[in-house]
């Protein structure tokens, strides 16, 4: 994958997250902000999830209260380089824990 393809795929990921949060109709307040390639999800309790892109490695990084995760694109899924879990699974787990209710992105 070249840099422009990586950015296109990361932009698509960011857009999907933003669209899902715009459609969020849960009880807790969840906000999303994109600034300079970093996506920040803020929760009502003050906690945050930070998602950023690591262009030199062509990875997406996810920082949550539970820890940090690095994802490589394998096929059409972003996969954690340590656990083998998908980006969406880990994001949904973290967002649900931090929101105090189930949050789905897919």
UniProtKB/Swiss-Prot annotation:
Stored SMART domains: Frataxin_Cyay (SM01219)
Purpose: Involved in iron-sulfur (Fe-S) cluster assembly. May act as a regulator of Fe-S biogenesis.
UniProt GO molecular function: ferric iron binding; ferrous iron binding
Official protein name in the record: Iron-sulfur cluster assembly protein CyaY
Pfam families reported for this sequence: Frataxin_Cyay
Domain of life the protein comes from: Bacteria
Paired cysteines (S-S): none
Family: Belongs to the frataxin family.
Swiss-Prot/TrEMBL GO biological process terms: iron-sulfur cluster assembly
Taxonomic source organism: Klebsiella pneumoniae subsp. pneumoniae (strain ATCC 700721 / MGH 78578)
Keyword Metal-binding (UniProt): yes
